[in-house]
Amino acid sequence: MIKYDILCTKKKRGIYMLKSWTPGEMPDREEMKRQLEKTKSSLYDLQMKIKEHKLPVLVLFEGWSAAGKGSMIGKVIRNIDPRFFKVATMSAPTEEEVRRPFLYRYMKQIPEEGKFTFLDSGWMEQTVKEVLNGELEGDAYERRIESIRRFERQLTDNGYLVLKFFMEIDKDEQEKRMKKLLSKDDTKWRVTGFDKWQNKHYKKCENVFDRYMKDTNMSSSPWYIID
């Protein structure tokens, strides 16, 4: 068996509740540099062990708009062998994908033995958007959650490692980052109408995120919050 450690700023056991969660205490700059250098070398070593033991690893980065999901993935993959991972950014589903079962397009991203797949937003984001749009509620929501739990259990029961990270920022920080992106011609396209709506209705979105994380937090695939 491979022994692995999850590195993140804040880790809790059990159910992760954003409303009761507080940011982790930040180490000083020099300590952060030492940790970063140690992590860089350990990531490559870990990847080689995963390849040797033929362990497939699915890593989901979810969270708020402008929280830095893509940037975080970029920092991770910078230090590992590109032959043994892929990154998938999941945009809105196509017409064909809408006609398929909800999890169909995510199933296509499942990694091979000994490889990583990094998902820049996955089935959490799509589910949360549908809830916020009023398209998914009541029994339909419960069925969706059960299908997600079953899917994740099938993966872990069959030897996959499923890691789920939630990128957390507060309302003011999100607004600050969006304003910075909007101030430059080469980055303003990254802020969508939904991103602005999310910041305006931050509390409502937080409640939906909170419920989803509670409903999908399992011992075999728990949530990890990164601030």
Please state what every model-predicted region is:
Residues I6, R13-D227:
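Glycine-rich phosphate-binding loop of ATP-dependent small-molecule kinases
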